[in-house]
Design a protein with these regions (language model features):
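Extreme N-terminal basic, low-complexity initiation segments
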Residues: 2-7
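Domain-edge interaction signal
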Residues: 11-228
Length: 228
């Protein structure tokens, strides 16, 4: 997946590796870690942001925007924004957890947005709308994350989801490498595919990200056990 001309990606030098060793990334492995409250709040705010700042924000468009946000941010920092795991489906990358929640939104998400029918040309589609009184909270995000979100909202403000296929279905991109003409249907799209093969110290960067994913998983497990 090509970059979208935002903040420069991190240089993977010694200081970056040290920073990554402290700031654990959400690096999806074979078993996704449970979503923390902070990450859940960030996800809800990201949905609010895209619903407020783009037109025709239905399910598929929202899924694509979240995918582009997560994979661009991972490409730059080694950490996703929402912590979602994406699968390769025919119509593009799908955050499966959100897909499963779509028909019955969790109480916290339902307090922020609703899904309403909207007539578009000759058919009816479901659109995400922000509920009255709900405001986007930028405090949940870093400046880098906000920059990516603003750039995506500006680029795809008036774009319908079918017109975004050229981006999410980019030849030899992350989705395409997994999808493989349907052979990889419903397979997980590794975040590592957002890092090009010729990236400086790619293997070292991904190794640190993987190690810190295990650390993050251990923290989440401890949090869950403490609340049990």
């Amino acid at each position: 997946m090509g970059g979208i001309g935002l903040l420069p990606a991190m240089a993977f030098d010694g200081s970056t590796m040290l920073a990554l060793s402290v700031y654990a990334p959400d690096f999806p492995g074979s078993k996704p870690t449970p979503m923390s409250k902070a990450t859940r709040n960030r996800l809800i705010n990201a949905i609010v942001f895209f619903a407020e700042n783009t037109d025709c924000c239905g399910k598929i468009k929202l899924f694509k925007l979240l995918y582009l946000l997560d994979f661009e941010h991972f490409k730059q920092t080694g950490k996703s924004v929402t912590g979602f795991e994406y699968q390769a489906w025919k119509f593009g990358p799908v955050p499966v957890d959100l897909m499963e929640e779509w028909e019955d939104l969790g109480p916290d998400l339902a307090r922020a947005v609703c899904i309403v029918p909207q007539r578009v040309l000759d058919f009816e589609r479901m659109q995400v709308e922000v509920l009255p009184g709900v405001e986007f909270d930028s405090d949940d995000f870093t400046e880098r994350q906000l920059s990516i979100m603003r750039a995506l909202a500006a680029r795809y403000k008036n774009t319908y989801s079918p017109q975004m296929i050229d981006v999410t279905h980019e030849q030899n991109g992350a989705w395409d490498k997994v999808w493989q003409d349907g052979r990889g249907s419903h397979e997980v799209i590794p975040y590592a595919l957002s890092i090009t093969d010729d990236a400086l110290d790619r293997e070292g960067f991904l190794k640190v990200a993987s190690q810190q994913a295990m650390y993050q998983s251990a923290l989440e497990a401890a949090r869950i056990n403490a609340g049990a």
